[in-house]
């Protein structure tokens, strides 16, 4: 199982040196990947039940940040977890991600999802209601653009006639993982995905996903059933889960062991919301996590 770190978007601050040091520390400590969250705009909370991020939460632009981290590191995988794809222009995302993959020497993993913030969609001029249908077509367009010098694609949301990227990415195609915990998402992953990023998904700013009977084990089994129905091998997709640094060493170990038993391939530690005041504290936190799990299951 591969261990990674969640980039502490909301707490790292704006010092480029601190951002570079965090990524380089993660690489030096032997972590496999850095997972970066995405939001373009934060919204003012809508009432006391709001559970999502707000305008007060800092988010570095994810693709620009990964370009910076590509130059600051040499080995560690760079992953979005997740990029809210339907609120972005597909061809532009294809170009940006291809460039990151080139600059990093083939180290990009693209995690995508539909998101929950309708305010963000409206501000970016995209349809919140159409996001589920759109993302499936976007996946097809991305893979066409990443693998062919010239593409002709005419769909519901895209029209490309004899056009393509130059240069193409190192990975052809770049791996596409998906976030989310609904049944629709699981079926989409089974048909189209390279991996599944679990944990912390919001159904809306007001209500988290209800507890699934059987927990993660039941969800993984459901995904495997959908993979079989789609004609794919049960272990055709990677499985990534997150664990909170604030949960403590005993919980880290228990989570890693449980996830390994379920066939999990990736586990990332999130250091946000643990009372860490400085970027250096986040580096110390991932060092402690790595020492607690020197040989992951």
Predicted segment positions?
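Active-site-adjacent structural elements that line small-molecule/cofactor binding pockets in enzymes
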Residues: 1-297
């Amino acid at each position: 199982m591969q261990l990674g770190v969640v980039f502490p978007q909301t707490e790292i601050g704006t010092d480029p040196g601190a951002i570079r040091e965090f990524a380089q520390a993660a690489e030096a400590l032997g972590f496999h990947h850095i997972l970066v969250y995405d939001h373009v705009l934060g919204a003012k909370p809508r009432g006391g039940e709001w559970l999502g991020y707000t305008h007060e939460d800092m988010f570095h632009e994810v693709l620009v940040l990964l370009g910076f981290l590509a130059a600051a590191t040499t080995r560690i995988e760079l992953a979005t977890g997740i990029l809210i794809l339907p609120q972005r222009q597909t061809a532009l995302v294809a170009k940006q991600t291809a460039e990151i993959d080139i600059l990093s020497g083939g180290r990009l993993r693209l995690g995508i999802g539909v998101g929950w913030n309708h305010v963000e969609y409206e501000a970016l001029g995209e349809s919140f209601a159409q996001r589920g249908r759109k993302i499936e077509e976007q996946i097809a367009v991305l893979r066409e653009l990443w693998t062919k010098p010239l593409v002709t694609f005419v769909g519901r949301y895209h029209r490309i006639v004899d056009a393509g990227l130059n240069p193409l990415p190192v990975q052809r195609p770049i791996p596409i993982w998906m976030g989310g915990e609904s049944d629709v998402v699981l079926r989409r992953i089974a048909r189209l995905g390279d991996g599944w990023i679990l944990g912390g998904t919001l159904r809306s700013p007001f209500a988290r996903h209800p507890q699934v009977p059987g927990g993660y084990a039941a969800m993984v089994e459901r995904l495997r059933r959908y993979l079989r129905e789609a004609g794919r091998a049960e272990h055709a997709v990677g499985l990534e889960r997150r664990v909170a640094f604030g949960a403590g060493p005993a919980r880290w170990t228990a989570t890693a062991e449980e996830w390994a038993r379920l066939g999990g391939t990736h586990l990332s530690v999130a250091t946000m919301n643990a009372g860490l005041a400085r970027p250096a504290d986040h580096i110390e936190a991932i060092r402690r996590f790595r020492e607690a799990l020197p040989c992951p299951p």
